[in-house]
Amino acid sequence: MSAAALELGVTHGAVSRQVRALEAQLGLPLLDRGARAVAPTPEGARLAAELAQSFERMQAAVARVRPGPLTLSSSATVMMRWLLPRLDRFKRAHPSIELRLTVSYGEVDFIRDEIGLAIRNSMVRAPPTALAETLIREEIGPVCHPDYASRVIADGPDALAARARILGTATRPEAWAEWARTIGRPDLGIAPDEVFGHFYLVIQAAACGLGFALAPRLLVEDEIAAGHLVAPLGFVPGPHDMQLWTAAHLRHRPDLRLVAEWLRREMAGTR
C-alpha cells in the first residue's frame, strides 16, 4: 500500500479506499489483511498479473506511435571506450535523429525504461521482450602500457604470471581464469594482485602503467592504435559475445532500424 501510494503520489488511505471500492464492485476480496501484513488473495494476485500485462501492452502501444528520442543503453565502459568516440560520425551523417544514451547494466525493462536498443555482453541473458543478435565475438588479451611491457618482458603466459602485476575487475572476477582456459593453460593459476570496481577503471589503470589488464580488443583497439596500450600476447577468441538487444515492440521504428544497422557496421569494422 505504501509503495503504491508513493508511486501514485497519493496517501496510503486513498489507495486503501480504491482497493476496497474495487473489491465491492467485483464482489470478492483481493487482499488478505492480517494484523502485521497485507498479502494478495489468489484472485488478487491473478488480477494484478493480468492487469500488469495489459498496462505493459498499453505502454508499448503508446511508445510505438509517440514521437520522441530513441534511447540506447550500454555499460559505462562500452559507452566511454567504444560508442562515444564513434558517435560524432553518426550524428553528422544523421542530424535529424534524436538519440539518447543511458548507462545501465544487466537486464533491461524496455517498456518501463523506454529503451529501444541495448548493447550487452552475452554473460547477461536477454529478456523475452528483446530481439537479441550477436554483433561480434569477443576477443580478449592482456594489455598494458608500452613502458611497463618493456620493463616486465612478459613474453609468454608463464612469464606474465611470474613477473607481471595482474589487475582485475569486480564486474568480471573470472576473466583471467577464463583467459587461461581459453589458451589451454587452466593450470596457470593467474590471479589479480589488485581489483578495481569497474571495467573502465582497470583499463585506465593499465594505461597508466599499473600492470596488466585483461580486456576485449573491442574496448582497447583505439588506445593500441594510438600507442597508449600494447598487447604483447595478442588476443584470442573469448567465451562471450557482444550482443545487440532490440525492443520487440519498437523494431519497426525507422530511426531504430537505422541506428541498429550503424551499430552492426561499426562493430563489423572492429573485427
Describe these PLM feature segments.
Residues 102-167, 171-174, 178-195:
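Acidic, Gly/Pro-rich loop/turn segments at junctions of secondary structure
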Residues 69-127:
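Central regulatory/effector-binding core of bacterial HTH transcription factors
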Residues 1-6, 13, 20:
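Residues within helix-turn-helix
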Residues 23-40:
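A short LG(V/I)-centered, amphipathic sequence patch enriched
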Residues 187-231, 237:
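Hydrophobic hinge/microswitch elements
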Residues 25, 47-66:
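Alpha-helical linker/hinge and terminal dimerization helices associated
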Residues 11, 18, 86:
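Residues within the DNA-recognition helix of helix-turn-helix
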Residues 235-271:
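A late-sequence structural motif
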